[in-house]
Amino acid sequence: MNKANIFCTDTNMKVILFSEVSVGISANSILFISHLCMFLGESRPKPIDLYIAFFSLTHLMLLVTMGLIAVDMFMPGGRWDSTTCTFLMYLHIVLRGPTLCATCLLNVLWTITLSPRNSCLTKFKHKSPHHISGAFLFLCVLYMSLSSELLSITASLNLTSENFLYVSQSCSILPMSYSIKSMFSTKMAIREAFLIGLMVLSSGYMVALLWSHKKQAQHLHSNSLSLKASPEQRATRTIMLLMSFFVVFYILDSVIFYSRMKFKDDSIFVCVQIIVSHSYVTVSPFVFICTEKHIIKFFWSLCGRIVNI
């Protein structure tokens, strides 16, 4: 079977991919709308609400782009020209950068929010939402500018090439030259190592804070221990669960990617990698939705208002 045609013939992959994209778009939309409304509706808005809205928006954009590509994978008859193919593939690859930036900065921001008053991070607690949105946009633009080599990728309607990087019904994108590929891989490895290292440091700091807070609470309430977790503990567990999902899916994505490079004739790795690489952005909003009860209450009240109109 031609590798280019596996997307059209494998019904299981089609169902899994479209289900993943649909669920991810729905969950991220709920998270985005709820936190944006909470940020705009409060008299003293919390910066963390705005940033979680940014976090879900980047995931939403990535999944929408993937949905457009998936439609072209499975629907017969190519409809894209070379320009459309290049633009969507470039946009999809580049959007993975802001997703990583959003996860990293969310981790750092949560660490700052939960830090004690005597911490050196206290001075960053009262920064306005403009500083947060500005920092996020700056990192996104910087990340995208460092990916300028991707603009040189070639979109082609030739689906018979054995060296394709990505294939849909309309186009295949051929590999970059060795020099461009080496430069891009080096810069990508450096920035991903920096962002992941920052996440590891902030996660370790939060674990230390959680342990210290737990010991202090046990010492103060040794005679009447409460089984109810504090808001700080719940927030720390949420972000640690989020980081755990990120690490697991990142490792799986890397393993499948290198397996795909090794077994070039086994095109099933292409489909599996697409599904795994979008699993984190699909699962992550459920971490917030399931742990933050006010999101569920917000949507129940919103549905009640709509019914009463």
UniProtKB/Swiss-Prot annotation:
UniProt cross-references to Pfam families, sorted A to Z: V1R (PF03402)
Knocked-out gene: effects: Mice lacking all but one V1ra and V1rb gene (12% of the V1r repertoire) show a lack of chemosensory response to a subset of known pheromonal ligands and changes in maternal aggression as well as male reproductive behavior.
Gene source species: Mus musculus (Mouse)
Name assigned to this protein: Vomeronasal type-1 receptor 46
Membrane-crossing residue ranges in chain numbering: 21-41, 51-71, 86-106, 135-155, 193-213, 238-258, 268-288
Bilayer topology annotation: Multi-pass membrane protein
Encoding gene (name): Vmn1r46
Gene Ontology molecular functions: pheromone receptor activity
Sequence ranges on the Extracellular membrane side: 1-20, 72-85, 156-192, 259-267
Topology Cytoplasmic: residue spans: 42-50, 107-134, 214-237, 289-309
Keyword Glycoprotein: yes
Known glycosylation sites: 158
Subcellular location per the Swiss-Prot or TrEMBL entry: Cell membrane
Protein purpose: Putative pheromone receptor implicated in the regulation of social and reproductive behavior.
